[in-house]
């Protein structure tokens, strides 16, 4: 016998929804805004005994847009459930690693797969219009297109699986998507970076070249699973620093594979993960993976006890700024470069509610010229941190033909990051002269020091008050 609860959930005699999960547990997650199908799917995979793990899985579903209710109500050629049933025999020889690798590449692609889907649907609409103009009824056209699309998608999906299996092998002889012949940068099997919270620092020898040392510190982020040669090129432009590849699942509910190039110290990092469910849920919405970035930036807390001047490029909705705020690092001045007015509005609202420093907004990174950079440096006494991650639209996504590497329209903006960083370093070295050299020597000592934390201090020039705050570290 089934009884309808007050929340509209059918219960059996044992008080379980649909005979598989306690109705109270289902109602709890439905009240949080998750769809019924998503909740049942998560409980089916995890069981009904650990609500914490169920929530983690639901957050992951929501972050990657994997809502089973979408697939069940559509006959689209993109329906993964139909394809998985049809390809069951073909997948007999798959192992779990292949599945996980393909799942990561296909779904954790930072939203660029949405653009592929929209373009595919637009092309499908054009095909239907063409068939209607030839005299076919629209219903028949749709059925024909859906059937043909499903068959074609099955073939493409099968080809993609074979390609992914091949891609999991050494890639030294593959032709890069962007036409370059850069040697690939192999990704580590376990993306744990230089260290993990509550885990001792492994033996990492990181000798940064002199030109990579500050001022300022810099921090660059992008997707780890980029086309062949991309990270080699990025590393070459950023002073041949080897990236720190990190899988964010070690830090928060979202699962993202990222690469970071920076000249920060790697000793004495502190973990700052929000332990509450609400904190982890909010972290999913930030442009950077806040927990991961905060862990890396935590070394700056003792170096800049009086606050920082930050140049934030491609800021999104402020993941970097949120990370610094959570670390308790005062942001005296932030020059923000973000082209999206929606993102800018969200970040400005957050800033007004939480910060007391100065926020300067620039819409387009191309408008940040060397002349404007020099004006800012003279006005605020220099930048302590240049941080950002250029768009990954041409580096990730399910449609490999859109992956143009660093030659793509959006990903090519990386070169503006390098241009601006190089201008900041050159101008600051020219303005501050010997003081900049002193900073560089102390920075090098900090990076080489193997003992306890070192608080960085530099001498002050009483005759020059314009750069007093930013150089008093």
Curated annotation (Swiss-Prot):
- The principal location of this protein is nucleus
Query: What organism is the protein native to?
Result: Oryza sativa subsp. japonica (Rice)
Catalysed reaction equations from the record: a 2'-deoxycytidine in DNA + S-adenosyl-L-methionine = a 5-methyl-2'-deoxycytidine in DNA + S-adenosyl-L-homocysteine + H(+)
Using the record's annotation, list all stretches that form the UBA domain.
20-61, 120-140
Report the protein name in the record: DNA (cytosine-5)-methyltransferase DRM1A
Region called Disordered, residue ranges:
84-115
Any one GO MF term held by the record is: DNA (cytosine-5-)-methyltransferase activity
Question: What Enzyme Commission number does this protein have?
Answer: 2.1.1.37
**Gene3D superfamilies in the record:** DNA helicase RuvA subunit, C-terminal domain (1.10.8.10), Vaccinia Virus protein VP39 (3.40.50.150)
Q: Cellular component terms, GO, for this chain's entry? A: nucleus
GO BP annotations of the record are:
methylation
Under InterPro entries, the record lists: C5_MeTfrase, SAM-dependent_MTases_sf, SAM_MeTfrase_DRM
Key words, A-Z: DNA-binding, Methyltransferase, Nucleus, Repeat, S-adenosyl-L-methionine, Transferase
